[in-house]
């Protein structure tokens, strides 16, 4: 997908690992118009494995040498930190053309995952997530909402998830968009009670979509409990 009004994405470029691990690594970075800090990733890994931030050229050779695989991805670093210095990762689900908020993870680490964030220990962060889940448009703003609509239309999928941050300009910073995004329900801890309505809304939308498609195919209705 090409960026358009309302959203931006990180510029990625594949490169042989031995180039970055050798004496010409910094020259390759400059030639391809990347600047430090930048991200370096081994393709095929998930949940942040083998995905690192390189602050300057001094750390490039060693970092590239220690990552697995013959090919790496050099990725532009787009700063998703807010005025408080914390990074934010929003997740929405796109079900049958509608956009649903799923969660907001806030962390002091640039590499934000809900399971490794400090949401459990920060009531103020949970309040911020609650505000996002309760009124997505007010939290994100019109530019980011327009960006989400553009991404939805470009994907053209019945089911998709999008992870993103917000730029100071109000534009959406796209991290990831795919058709296999997981809807992970929180545990029974009462601290997460505010998240359950949003998750239920997404699951209900998925069930309704499946039933609609099944009815169109002349299939029997699908039991909600089996989903």
Give the positions of each predicted feature.
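Hydrophobic residue at the +6 position relative to the catalytic HRD Asp in the kinase catalytic loop
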Residues: 162-164
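C-terminal active-site "lid" helix and adjoining low-complexity regulatory extension at the edge
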Residues: 138, 153-157, 166-227
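Short, internal acidic amphipathic alpha-helical interface segments
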Residues: 143-158
């Amino acid at each position: 997908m090409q960026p358009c009004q309302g959203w931006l994405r990180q510029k990625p470029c594949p490169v042989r690992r031995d180039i970055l691990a050798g004496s010409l690594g910094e020259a390759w970075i400059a030639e391809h118009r990347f600047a430090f800090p930048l991200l370096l990733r081994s393709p095929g890994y998930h949940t942040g494995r083998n995905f690192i931030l390189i602050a300057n050229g001094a750390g490039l050779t060693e970092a590239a040498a220690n990552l697995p695989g013959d090919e790496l991805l050099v990725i532009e670093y787009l700063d998703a930190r807010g005025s408080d210095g914390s990074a934010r990762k929003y997740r929405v689900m796109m079900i049958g053309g509608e956009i649903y908020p799923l969660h907001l993870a806030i962390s002091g680490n640039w590499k934000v995952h809900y399971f490794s964030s400090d949401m459990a220990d920060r009531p103020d962060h949970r309040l911020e997530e609650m505000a996002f889940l309760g009124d997505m448009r007010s939290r994100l703003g019109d530019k980011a909402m327009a960006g989400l609509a553009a991404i939805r239309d470009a994907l053209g999928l019945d089911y998709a998830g999008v992870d993103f941050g917000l730029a100071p300009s109000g534009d959406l910073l796209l991290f990831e968009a795919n058709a296999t995004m997981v809807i992970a329900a929180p545990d029974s801890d009462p601290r997460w009670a505010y998240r359950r309505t949003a998750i239920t809304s997404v699951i209900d939308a998925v069930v309704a979509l499946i039933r609609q498609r099944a009815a169109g195919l002349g299939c029997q209705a699908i039991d909600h409990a089996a989903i």
